[in-house]
């Protein structure tokens, strides 16, 4: 997820078994939610793959994102990923935004209301170029899941 971590714990079972469980959990969560892994579900969706069936982790973060988006009156918006990348803060290539037309074209790709999670577990985006970025929520979700695991 584009970051490092340090976990300290005490356990009555061997540390290597706990570490294997942590590694497995992080693998699953990264495979679902990391924009820094090209083969993660969210990266595939961001490239326009509408056939990806998301797992329960993606669904949980999607639902929380919707809740926060509504509570904030739209100020929290996971579709700002294209802007995040354009200004050099994300995993994708930096784009120099030189004109207001370029900025306007990216702004058209924002708006959480343009993204839907279908009952079949696939994600529908009004425009295939919409870039979803859950990083504001995903890291906290990972910590919560780690707490459940431990």
Protein language model features and the residues they cover:
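Cysteine-centered nucleophilic/redox motifs
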Residues: 136-150
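A contiguous, well-ordered beta/alpha segment that forms the leading edge of an enzyme domain
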Residues: 1-135, 148
């Amino acid at each position: 997820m584009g970051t490092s971590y340090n976990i300290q714990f005490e356990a009555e079972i061997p540390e290597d078994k706990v570490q294997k469980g942590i590694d497995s959990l992080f693998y699953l969560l990264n495979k679902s939610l990391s924009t820094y892994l090209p083969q993660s579900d969210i990266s595939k969706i961001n490239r326009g793959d509408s056939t990806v069936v998301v797992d329960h982790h993606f669904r949980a973060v999607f639902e929380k994102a919707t809740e926060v988006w509504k509570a904030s009156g739209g100020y929290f918006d996971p579709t700002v990923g294209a802007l995040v990348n354009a200004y050099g803060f994300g995993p994708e290539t930096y784009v120099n935004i030189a004109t207001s037309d370029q900025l306007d074209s990216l702004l058209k790709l924002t708006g959480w209301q343009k993204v839907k999670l279908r009952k079949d577990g696939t994600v529908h985006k009004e425009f295939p170029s919409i870039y979803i970025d859950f990083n504001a929520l995903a890291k906290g979700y990972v910590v919560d899941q780690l707490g459940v695991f431990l």
